[in-house]
Amino acid sequence: MKRALVCGAGGFIGGHLVKRLKAEGYWVRGVDIKEHEFHPSVADEFVLGDLREQSVCRKITGDLRFDELYQLAADMGGAGYIFTGEHDAAVMHNSATINLNMVEEAKNSGIPKIFYSSSACIYPEEAQMDPANHGLPEKIAYPAHPDSEYGWEKLFSERLYLSYQRNYGIDVHIARFHNVFGPEGTWEGGKEKAPAAMCRKVAETADSGEIEMWGDGEQTRTFLYIDECLEGVRRLMESDFSGPVNIGSDELISINDLAKMVMGFSGKDLRIRHIPGPLGVRGRSSDNKLIQEKLGWRPTWPLSKGMEITYRWIEDQVRSRRNP
């Protein structure tokens, strides 16, 4: 039986990844600074620990022989957390420290294969000024100019892991995630992403009411459902391709149209009030030519399919909170 160590197992993607690995027959140790928000972890062992502490990283890697490490732990959140500038130092310090600690202890304990979750936020800001974005191929990451400290740290850590691959022979695989969403993700409190925030606003608002939206709503994104994200991760880890490679949808949608899609699921007719707020770039889409070439696969789910599943889940969360 293969053993996997999942860092960030108390988070959205990490929690789903643990379930996927267990379904494939892995023995899994999950690690996070917090428990999973919505259910107990299904990991064989779940360790509460702060990966900014090197002693914690040494302990979780040193007592067992792991076949694979999945490093998803990071200080992150939605636009309201990443783009205000108020958390820049924490994002840089916390995430960089986690990655420096984990890759060193993985090397010291002889973990042969590592997955690192990077982000589309590494791409240059000037390549994302047009809402009609035609996709961000991996090769345009340099010259580097991410639009946030979150993106800069991700780019640094890509290079960190690849340097350990070159110098120590670790089999490293890196994916650049593009706006992953789905059930069991944060949907309130300021760290939620756009799909969850939109679902919450619509679910909480009475018919004929009004929801608020940052900016003019013409900014565009692609959003990837969690099941397809995990399929991409597992295919990448089973391949001989290191990446970095995009794992994302190429179905571009404006935030205005995303809101209308969610309203359609709800059956409500709501007004949108546009207000000032952090926006990020104007247009971001995944270019999937490389993943198709290297893995013979690309995401295919229509956005509406995943969004309806997510809306129904968040609608249930809102209803349960109102009627405990």
Language-model segments: residues:
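C-terminal substrate-binding subdomain of Rossmann-fold SDR/epimerase-dehydratase oxidoreductases
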Residues: 204-324
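NAD(P)-dependent short-chain dehydrogenase/reductase
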Residues: 126-135, 159-237, 250-252, 260-266
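Conserved glycine-rich Rossmann-like NAD(P)H-binding loop of the short-chain dehydrogenase/reductase
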Residues: 26-35
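NAD(P)H-binding glycine-rich loop region in Rossmannoid oxidoreductase-like domains
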Residues: 51-95, 108, 125
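Conserved Rossmann-fold NAD(P)-dependent oxidoreductase catalytic core, especially the SDR/UDP-sugar
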Residues: 100-147
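Rossmann-fold cofactor-recognition segment
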Residues: 42-53
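Active-site helix of classical SDR
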Residues: 149, 153
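N-terminal Rossmann NAD(P)H-binding glycine-rich loop of SDR-like oxidoreductase domains
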Residues: 4-24
